[in-house]
């Protein structure tokens, strides 16, 4: 990830959130866990983060699931929105600056669509949906690196081009809203673009995040709408995380091959998945296996021990080394950053390593020795000086148990 941060201290950032009709799986957390760590690294460098995250609480999948369960869409989405917030807390992910539900901003989204219509970027298809005409955007394809000619196969049944997308879907199925375009609801691509346009006051984002699977058509269509209204790209920088596979297969609910985030947390320390996600360069696919989880479980135990040993040897941290490692994480060079961490471990630079872990927001950094326990370290030091190693080991073992249970 390369970000142009010259002359910037306040960063406007957006990440597409979950469609809340079911529990999130562990792969859904890759981008937001990485963001959580990188944002802390940026704050360490003096940056201010203005982070918008949306909750898609109206969608065909939501309507179908609510009807299947015999409950309202609002009941369903409230349940899974709250479940998502619990997951953020369990995995030690800071809540974004602002979280907004799509249904809270329907009027703003309608106003946004009106602007696109007024500027002549829309038409009605044969279903009477209001559609965005990509032929009106000369640089359509710039985000996904595609030539517009390859995207313009005709689809005369409904739209001028197969890639024209719905801004307002005319429907009375499930939850719908009143607008000048008829009864219906907004299209997904428009929801995100409108929220960004409104919250960030028409400005381009400094960073837009998401998974690699969203490059086309979602990110492309968001950008097309923003460009149509402002003449500028929707984001100056993009961050996209790679796929998380499970035992060699794509992790997807449709394939019945998922590991729910809540189930992961019941079985494993949540720091393990943070360690996995921060050890592999962001765009590289991850194959989640029992062996990989086991390896990072051992690594987390090693990291915990380092934070414990810091109490016994609080030498000054090497600020330049901390900055070097954090900069590598900001640049998305996770493998190189982890190599340097391993070098620091060999050198027993515990203060420096602990500072890095604090910035990466590992939950184990909250483990503490209380003042009374720290006083016992003085006794330990005296016993070491007196070469009474067996008694010193007993104190150390006692303190380790206190630390682990803190």
From Swiss-Prot:
This is Cysteine--tRNA ligase. It comes from Mesomycoplasma hyopneumoniae (strain J / ATCC 25934 / NCTC 10110) (Mycoplasma hyopneumoniae). ATP binds at residue 253. Its EC number is 6.1.1.16. Gene3D superfamilies: HUPs. The keyword Protein biosynthesis applies. The lineage of its organism: Bacteria, Bacillati, Mycoplasmatota, Mycoplasmoidales, Metamycoplasmataceae. One of its GO terms (biological process) is cysteinyl-tRNA aminoacylation. Its cofactor is Zn(2+).
